[in-house]
Amino acid sequence: MGNLKSLVLLALLFSFSVAVFANTSNDATHDEVKPSTEATHAIEAQKHDGKPQIAEAQVEANDPVVEPQQDWGGRGGCRWGCCGGWWRGRCRYCCRSQAEASEVVETVEPNDVEPQQGGRGGGGGGGGGRGGCRWGCCGGWWRGRCRYCCRSQAEASEVVETVEPNDVEPQQGGRGGGGGGGGGRGGCRWGCCGGWWRGRCRYCCRSQAEASEVVETVEPNDVEPQQGGRGGGGGGGGGRGGCRWGCCGGWWRGRCRYCCRSQAEANEVVETVEAQQAKP
């Protein structure tokens, strides 16, 4: 009996030892596999913090670079001209070079220009400063037509305040008649380098060199041979700008750059202006 009790005690001790060893091994395995809660939070924080920094860097890289407005006048406030849109009479994107400016001019379609609406002026040709638009021209010019007409009187007034008086030479002459000296030059000292409205030049040449440059760019074939006089006395063609059916384009030194080819074309121009004037 004594030997039997001893064997039972040894068996119990062995079983207890095996159970304790198994529990110790399981605890060690769990400690190696599972990371601590603090380490997990630290890793997630690093992942989230990295995304805003990358997004901010991308936004800064995509920001457009706009050249500061350097001047004002026929070039839209840019050195070589405006190659982008307009906002309140200021260019959003200035041409970087003369080559880029020339490329933009070649791609300007007639439909890109808002239909000219006609000025409210009368008598003394008050609409000249309005550039053929109801409230004035707030953008650039192309072939004697405004690229962007002011949308309201307030916008036009804001543009007028930013234009320096020296940018446009005061109109000096009349509309011709008798021996009106300035009539042939459109009321300007060196000639008219812009469009016309009611017999007055919209933009006077700054110098003789600028006037000569404009003359060289006008192709003779673009202008129908002038058939009438420049006014004065009872010159029949004077009122039509020296054209049989009227002038459908710009003017230069009192002569039309593009004459209407037919009475129908002349009527179409008149109807367009009258329709725009009738709008509220």
Curated annotation (Swiss-Prot):
Regulation: induction: Induced by cold stress.
Keywords linked to the UniProt accession: Glycoprotein, Repeat, Signal
Region spans: Disordered: 163-184, 218-239
Signal peptide extent: 1-22
Record region (4 X 22 AA repeats, Cys-rich): 76-262
Coiled coil location: none
Residues of this chain annotated as glycosylated in UniProt: 23
Organism domain of life: Eukaryota
Function according to Swiss-Prot or TrEMBL: May be involved in the acquisition of desiccation tolerance during late phase of embryogenesis.
Protein name: Late embryogenesis abundant protein M17
Organismal lineage: Eukaryota, Viridiplantae, Streptophyta, Embryophyta, Tracheophyta
Record gene name: M17
